[in-house]
Amino acid sequence: MPGVVMDNATVGGPRRASESPDNVSSTPFPQERVNQSGDSGDRRNRSIFHNGAVKGAQGPGQHIETHTGKDGINESEGLPELAHITQGFFPFSTLVNRSVQQCWNDLSELVTELAAIQVSPHGQMPSTPANGKAPGDQSPENLQKKTRILDFAHAKRAEFIKLLVLSQWSRQAGDVSRLIDLQNFIRNRHQAFMDALQRIGDMKRDLVQAQVANPDLKTALEVLSKGRVVSITDLGYEAPKQLTAKGALKRLHKINRIISARLALHDTIPRPFRTYRVHDGRATFVVQGEFELDLSVGEESKSSQFFFVDIRFLFSPSSHVPKGRLSNELDVQVNDRLRDNGLKGCFDFLHGLVLTNKITILFKQAVELARGLWSDVLRVELLHRTLVVQYWALKLGAKSWIEIGIKSGRKPHDVKDSGVPYLALRWIRDGQEVDSTSVEFDADDLSMERLLRSIIALHISHLLSATYSILNQRSLFATGLLSLQALLNTNEPGKCQLLAQLTVSRHLRVSIEPMSGAIVLSADPSPLDRSESDSSLEKSSVDDIVSRVSRLRCIAALEEAESTVKILGFETVSPRGLKADVRKILPPNILRFALFWHPFWDRSWIVAATSSTDGDSWWVIHLRRPSALATSALNLDKDIHREATVCSGHVISNTFLAVQHLARDSSFADLSHCLSGMVAIHANASYLADLRSVAFQPPLRALKFESGLEVPNLLVRYQVSTLPRALQLVFPAGVGKKDFIRNTVRVAFHGIDQRRKVVIFVAYGNLLVPMKELSTLVSKLDGSLVFKQEGDSFAIRLLAPAGQPVIVQLFESLQRLECMLSIFEFLRRKKLVIRSLSLSQVAFAYGPRRSLAAVMDIGMSKLSNSEQLDPVDILARTDPLLLLRLGIRFDHSNPHRRIQGSLAAILNHTSNKAALDSVAEILSFTLPAMRTLDQITSNLSRGEPARLQVVVRNAFTFLLHYINYALRFELTASQHAGRLTWVLRESGDPQVGPGQDQIRAKLRDTLYNSNGNGWKGLGNGVVADVEGVCSVISNLDTSFAGARDNQETSGDVKPTERSLNQTDVKNHRDHDFDAQAAMDYDTSAVATNSAGARSSQQCDAPPEAADVITID
């Protein structure tokens, strides 16, 4: 049995004589080749068995290796022994050896595999169970090893069990081997019987050709001798007469009548055959676009069949049916159909033949195209009677093809059609079947190239039309800002184009290459991007075309915008240097954007030009710069915006097509002016939005370019009470906080100062109460403040780099303006002459004839750099950032110049609510005394050494020191008899010096014990009113002047040359009394006399308020 392992002891080995039933020799069988017919061969079988397969073994239909005892058979020796089959057998020992060798190899691999598994030497040892048996190492690696060993043992055990079964079976396989031999013998005999039958049949067939009829010598002899055979009957046929032309014509007319009558009265003519004509003895049926068929009859009987005469095809390209076998076969087939099925059967056969012929012609044309110009782009396949042509084969995505086949049923839109099969076209475009009625498919004039061009033209028209519809919905094209035109053609694909205007000066032509289907984009005047402009073999879907056109339009728009702004000095900012992605703040429809920055701007602000098919926009983007240390390091880098974080972004214009308008009709500087203005306005609006407590209009999202690229104004609600505490000015107590300005201030952008590289803002506001005098009083030297002629509105100029807010400066200026207006109102109420006004000072005139001039300064003390503070820091502060400081100045000829420091201290006193009234009262009260002192000190007629020094303690306390006599006098203001008066007393140690007795005696006579106009002696001093103090000071000085003249005449006393230096002044202050005590005294003296000066003397006199004046 082939494939069964036989034991050598029973199969394939020598047999004992007792085991052979036919007494065959027990020697090994001779190795001879015997075929199935019993013929012995000469070639010896020298095949060697390897692993159960015989080298050079033959198949079942070939010779079989057998063993026979002898070449011939002798009947006296009995029947021959059956051929013994050994093909496919191999020794059992070979299988055992191979199994053992395989087991050894697998065991070696197992050992190698187990050695590669590392077992941890310090595995966790579980505790000993109660039975005392240790479970051993239970680590996963050790368990894996054990599992592999068990699997190997089970597998090999199963294999050796199979070997054991085979070994037991092979010891009893002798009977099976004999059965195999018997079966082989029966098969050989059956095959020999079948071969005999085949040979008999072949012989019978071959003998047919060898048959020869017996010769009819009698008939042959009669024919040769008499020329006829009497035994053959004469049918009586006569030879036809020669047919003349007239007879032929007559017979043709007769046939015509027969055919006409038959077709008109008897035969059923199918609808396609109803167009016919009878002529020349035949009927010619015309099937439009297919063929002309000539039929005729052979008998007059109405039931006789028509016979085929000729056929001519009416479509092109076509050819006549060649004479010969094809024509004869066609004649037979048509006549058979006419005989069996009449005219209808004939039409059905020829109609199907023509349709198949047309499909074949189209197939040949398509193959020729695929081998020629359309190579690699067409795929042609003929399935039964359906032609499939795939075009644009190299395109990715959904495929497109056409199917031309025979379709049964009624034609669409043909009422008269009787359901005859026709040549139909099926169009699958991008994987979807579409209507093919618009395809130019002429079944009469077959042209595959024309059909393909029509199909491709319709496909391209569909793509471009869909692209046009999508793009025309975008705002740029829908509103007519950009032109869009689609040129479509249903027959010629090369004439299908989409013309799109990218910018004012650039246009794009979109077409699709007919053969390959590649998108071709060509820009005019020049290609923008080679990767975008060249043809692409990617899938030409509508979305892809729209995407590429949109991308090119955005590239063109940004190119023009970038080239324009670079001329204006803008620099490009790389988005890669920013920490955050700018696209996060931009709408998702933005396809391209570019970032720009101007050197005049703050680094925290940039602009972005964005472009999409819905419109082009300018954006203002706010950046958060790194820390101060990082910023200083970045200053050395070329990219100053690196590592900046994007905070916010707002659109400022929905188009920058005006860039071309500016370039054509205006100067480039206008664009820089507009963008800088929008950056500046947005910086201030963003600052106000972060403050949250100050309302403004319009909101950030509405701050956009107005008509004519005008920068919008910012309306800010100004109300001091709603301002953050840090931005509220701390006014001196003497300046009343009164509202003068209406609560809406308009901040407008007024250009750029190119020299100082700053943006000019103008804040426009209105006053609650008009003051007509303001317009003429504003100083022309200060251009930061202007009042309208009616005096009801004002304008304040503010300067700052673009991107830095002026909000703090605005609120500071407005509050300073209110302070200035408060001072103006006070001076006007006091009927003082105001000469000029500005935010920093108020100049006025006073005195009896308004001959004295004074300037009141409005200064500012900043606790920190408020311009650099973040709004969050401002909101977090509870203390004010700005302190308003008032000062007063006099010219060098004004007698009040000595007390301007003291007056400034009074103006800025934190608790003196009547400081302005106090200063006005002091100016009026001290003017006579100051003038007298000024007259004495300004007497330069004599070149004398200095004899008098005047030390100003405060506005109400003066120290008069006569150097020659070492005498000091104190002139103070105090209350006397219910009114404010001047009091003169001697100050210092009551020591007697040279000449002092004489002076004191003279002073007692002329001052202390005397009375005068407006003054009165007190014994140890003098009290005088406002006007009387002039006489007191003059008499005092006259006494010292007369005493000096007497001393110089007698020569008794030498003048003291020592002057009172600053140290003496200081010692004198410390020795007598401090300034605060003196001021308190002065205040108590003035309080009962003037209600307006009730608290004017409660401020300290600083050291710088003391003026030392030396009299020459």
From Swiss-Prot:
**Gene Ontology terms describing biological process:** regulation of transcription by RNA polymerase II
The source's superkingdom equals Eukaryota
Amino acid composition bias (Polar residues), ranges on this chain:
20-39, 1088-1099
Pfam families under this entry? Med14
Supply one GO CC term from the record: core mediator complex
**Localization per Swiss-Prot or TrEMBL:** Nucleus
For this UniProt entry, the molecular function terms from Gene Ontology, in alphabetical order, are: transcription coregulator activity
Coiled-coil ranges (or none): none
Quote the InterPro entries the UniProt record gives: Med14_N, Mediator_Med14
- Please classify the protein's predominant subcellular localization into one broad category: nucleus
The UniProt keywords, alphabetically, are: Activator, Nucleus, Transcription, Transcription regulation
Residue ranges annotated as compositionally biased, kind Basic and acidic residues, are 64-73
What this chain does, per the entry, is described as:
Component of the Mediator complex, a coactivator involved in the regulated transcription of nearly all RNA polymerase II-dependent genes. Mediator functions as a bridge to convey information from gene-specific regulatory proteins to the basal RNA polymerase II transcription machinery. Mediator is recruited to promoters by direct interactions with regulatory proteins and serves as a scaffold for the assembly of a functional preinitiation complex with RNA polymerase II and the general transcription factors.
Oligomeric state and partners? Component of the Mediator complex.
Family label: Belongs to the Mediator complex subunit 14 family.
- Kindly provide the name given to this protein in its UniProt entry: Mediator of RNA polymerase II transcription subunit 14
Gene name as annotated: rgr1
